[in-house]
Amino acid sequence: MSKDDSIKKTVTIGLSAAIFFVLSCFASIPVGFNVSIETSVAFLAFIAVAFGPAVGFYVGLIGNTIKDFILFGNVSWNWVLCSALIGFIYGLPHKIIDLKYQVFTKKKIVYFWLYQVAFNFIIWGFFAPQSDLLIYGQPPKLVYLQSFLIVISNILAYSVVGIKLMSMYSCHYNKQATLIKINNS
């Protein structure tokens, strides 16, 4: 990785973590049981797919840490680590999806939608509630109800906001690439 790439990724992480925090605070819809539909989750998926797993990991880690500390006064490290992990996992297929240089086709939309559904169930439906049970000893019914609502709200947020962000980003870069090819001809 060149020096310019590392600077771009560092700046992307910082700005994206700040946007993640702002979206968590001001662009979420409460659904009950201390659960909200978070547009920040869709933004995390977009950033991770656009810039890769390392950026997704750090945006999830830093953004969720800042959110927890400022909103709640303490940090639930198990949930922060789950956010970081989901950011990393979202970023793994970034070279396959390649929003910057390839069209975000229906096939890629369906692929990533199924991918994020599966990993939302694994991370937020299994790891997060298990960690709450082990660390905090919370009532299992409440923990699993919350995790179910979180999985559903994350899927909804990605379906509505995430797909739109990725499509717009892909369209922007693909139009630029087309214009560059036309001008160079």
From Swiss-Prot:
Gene3D superfamilies: 1.10.1760.20. Disulfide bonds: none annotated. One of its GO terms (cellular component) is plasma membrane. It holds the Pfam family ECF-ribofla_trS. It comes from the Bacteria. The keyword Transcription does not apply. This is UPF0397 protein PAM_019.
